[in-house]
Amino acid sequence: TLLKTLMGERLADFTIRGEIQTDLQSLAYIPQHLPEDLKKKTLHDYFFLDSADLDYSILYRLAEELHFDSSRFASDQEIGNLSGGEALKIQLIHEFANPFEILFLDEPSNDLDIEMVDWLKNNIQKMRQTVIFISHDEDFLSQTADTIIHLRLIKHRKEAETLVEHLDYDSYSDQRKANFARQSQQAANDQRAYDKTMEKHRRVKQNVETALRATKDSTAGRLLAKKMKNVLSQEKRYEKAAQSMTQKPLEEEQIQLFFSDIEPLAASKVLVRLENETLSIGQRILSQGLQLTVRGQDKIGIIGPNGVGKSTLLAKLHQLLSGKREISLGFMPQDYQETLQLDLSPVEFLSQTGHKEEIQKIQSHLASLNFSYPEMHHQIHSLSGGQQGKLLLLNLVLRKPNFLLLDEPTRNFSPTSQPEIRKLFANFPGGLVTVSHDRRFLKEVCTSIYSLTEHGLEVVDLQDL
C-alpha cells in the first residue's frame, strides 16, 4: 500500500493522510504478483507495442545476462503462461531497458533463484537511481539497502508505528536488538525498584492501620488518621509514577515455537535412495541421473535455477516418504493453499478432537504468535501470508513429525521473524529436506547442500553459498 501510494496510485479502499512531494517524470515498478492485465499480453506486445523509449542494446544485454532467449521477445506467448521466475525476468528486462528515475520493487527475490538474486543485488548496488523495495530476505537487504523503513504493529498489533533509519540492514538489526535488550533491562530495574518501594510502603500502611485499630486515645487517633491520609496520598503518587515506568518491550513479530517430544529416526537409517533417477513433467525431462540418499536425521538443502524441478523433486520425496509406516511426515508447501483449508478458522484447522482443553491449548499457542482473538476465529483466507505461514509452522509443531519437507519455508516471513524460523528448524531433532534460495537459512539449518541441474544433483560446499 505504501509503495503504491508513493507511486501516486489512488487507492479506493484506503484513507491516505499527509503530503507527497515529487517531481519525478518516470518510474519503474515490478509488483509481487503478476497483474491480471499483464497476464493476457503477449511477449511481443509487452516489449514492442509501445517501445519508443526502449533501449535495445540494454534489452539484449539483459536477456543474455538473465539467460532469457531474446528470440522469444517477438513471441505470441502470453505472459500469464510463463513460470513465476520467467515472468519476473521479463519484467526486470523490460523495466531496466526503459529510462526511469526511481525503481519500486515488491518482494523481488521471491521468484528468483540464487544466481538471479545475486544478479539483482549487483545491479541495485551499481544503480545511480533511487530504489525503494519491499523484502523479507535478510541477505538481500543487508547487501543492498542503505536506509530502512520499518512498518510494524505494536501494542498487540493494535497500533501502527513507522521507523526510518539511515543505516544498512545489519546495523539496523543490531541496533534494534541492543535497544530491545536495554529497554528490557531498564524495565526490569524499574520494576524491582517499584516493588521494593511498594513493599516498604505496605509495611508502613499496615503499621498505621494496626495502630489505628488498637488506639483508644482520641488525640493519638486523630494523629494516626492524619498519618493514614498521608500514606494513602503517597500510595496514589506511587501508582501515578508507575504509569511512567519503562515498559517491558514486546517483540511483536517474534515466533515463539519449538519442537518437543519428537522421536527422531535413527541417524543411520536410510529413508530414500535415488539411483540414476529422472525428474519429468509429462513428456518434458527436467533432470536426469539423480543420485541421492536421505537418512533419518539428515538436513538437506536443495538449490538450483528456476524451472529445473526442485519442487518436483520435493513432491517425489513426499510420495516416497508418505507410504512409510515409521515416518511421521510434516510438509510445508510453497503455496500454503495446498495444505491450509481456507474456509476454516485457525482454531478449527488445528483442532483434532474439539475438546475444551485442546482448544484452550491451541488458542494459547496462537496468542504467543500474536494472533488476536478475532484472527483465531476468522476464516484463514482473511489472514496475511505471514499469519498463514505461522499457522502452518504451528501445525507442524503440534503434529510432532520426525521428518520434514519444506518448500521455501521463509518465503512469507518478515525479516524480524527470520532468525526464529532458522532457530526452530536448526534445533529440530529429526531430519528434513528443504528447497530454499535463502542463504542464511541454508547455512544455519542444513548440514548438506545440493544444486539440482539438468544433469542431476551436485554437492555444494556451504562456504561457497
Identify the meaning behind each predicted range.
Residues L3-Y56, T147, R152-R157, G296-K361, ...:
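ABC ATPase nucleotide-binding domain signature region
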Residues L153-Q185, L452-L465:
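Conserved beta-strand-loop-alpha-helix hinge in the C-terminal portion
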Residues L54-Q77, Q175-Q283:
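Coupling and communication elements adjacent to P-loop NTPase active sites across diverse families
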Residues K248-Q334:
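Flexible loop/N-cap segments at domain edges
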Residues E107-P108, D113, L405-P409, F413-S417, ...:
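Walker B catalytic motif
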Residues Q25-A87, N98, Q334-N395, R399-P401:
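ABC-family P-loop ATPase nucleotide-binding domains
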Residues L92, L393, I421:
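Hydrophobic anchor residue at the start of the ABC signature
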